Amino acid sequence: MSEWMKKGPLEWQDYIYKEVRVTASEKNEYKGWVLTTDPVSANIVLVNFLEDGSMSVTGIMGHAVQTVETMNEGDHRVREKLMHLFTSGDCKAYSPEDLEERKNSLKKWLEKNHIPITEQGDAPRTLCVAGVLTIDPPYGPENCSSSNEIILSRVQDLIEGHLTASQ
């Protein structure tokens, strides 16, 4: 078993957003910035920023990893670039105040439509509908989660109506 596989998910997480050199089986060597590690398989996803402004993404299977050596700790700029790598251009960032306003507005809308709604969690950010559906920030139809497809569809339609009415 390799040195990498002997480590656990919390130790693998320490490599995220750092530039590393990975030695894999058959003496293959990879360099790049660690975007993420898989806590189950120990796979590593490396990103390299190319000179033409594009990037390359490489996945290395956890069982093939022999050693991982940190080359560079990275700075805030690199971290931000990696964090927003796969977010779409239309992805909006919301301030805590905006999120609170959206949550309260949606909660009132759902209550007005006689939908039983509660807040759940330590920092009550997630809305819960009848104990079978959750709505996470930023409280859009795509942020709903439920195993009951009928309730999911109806609540998503209500949220869509709310967003249309409030614009």
Swiss-Prot record:
Modified residues (Phosphoserine): S95, S166
InterPro entries reported in the protein's UniProt record: AD, Gemin6, Gemin6_C, Gemin6_Sm-like_dom, Sm
Pfam family, one: Gemin6_C
Cytoplasm found in the keyword field: yes
Sm domain ranges (all copies): 7-74
Keyword check for Cell inner membrane: no
Alphabetized UniProt keyword annotations: Cytoplasm, mRNA processing, mRNA splicing, Nucleus, Phosphoprotein
GO biological process: mRNA splicing, via spliceosome; spliceosomal complex assembly; spliceosomal snRNP assembly
Location within or outside the cell: Nucleus, Nucleoplasm; Nucleus, Gem; Cytoplasm
Domain of life: Eukaryota
Signal peptide range in chain numbering: none
Gene Ontology MF, one: RNA binding
Gene Ontology CC: cytoplasm; cytosol; Gemini of Cajal bodies; nuclear body; nucleoplasm; SMN complex; SMN-Sm protein complex
Residue intervals of the AD domain: 69-167
Subunit composition and interactions: Part of the core SMN complex that contains SMN1, GEMIN2/SIP1, DDX20/GEMIN3, GEMIN4, GEMIN5, GEMIN6, GEMIN7, GEMIN8 and STRAP/UNRIP. Part of the SMN-Sm complex that contains SMN1, GEMIN2/SIP1, DDX20/GEMIN3, GEMIN4, GEMIN5, GEMIN6, GEMIN7, GEMIN8, STRAP/UNRIP and the Sm proteins SNRPB, SNRPD1, SNRPD2, SNRPD3, SNRPE, SNRPF and SNRPG. Interacts with GEMIN7; the interaction is direct. Interacts with GEMIN8; the interaction is direct. Interacts with SNRPB, SNRPD2, SNRPD3 and SNRPE; the interaction is direct.
Purpose: The SMN complex catalyzes the assembly of small nuclear ribonucleoproteins (snRNPs), the building blocks of the spliceosome, and thereby plays an important role in the splicing of cellular pre-mRNAs. Most spliceosomal snRNPs contain a common set of Sm proteins SNRPB, SNRPD1, SNRPD2, SNRPD3, SNRPE, SNRPF and SNRPG that assemble in a heptameric protein ring on the Sm site of the small nuclear RNA to form the core snRNP (Sm core).
Protein's recorded name: Gem-associated protein 6
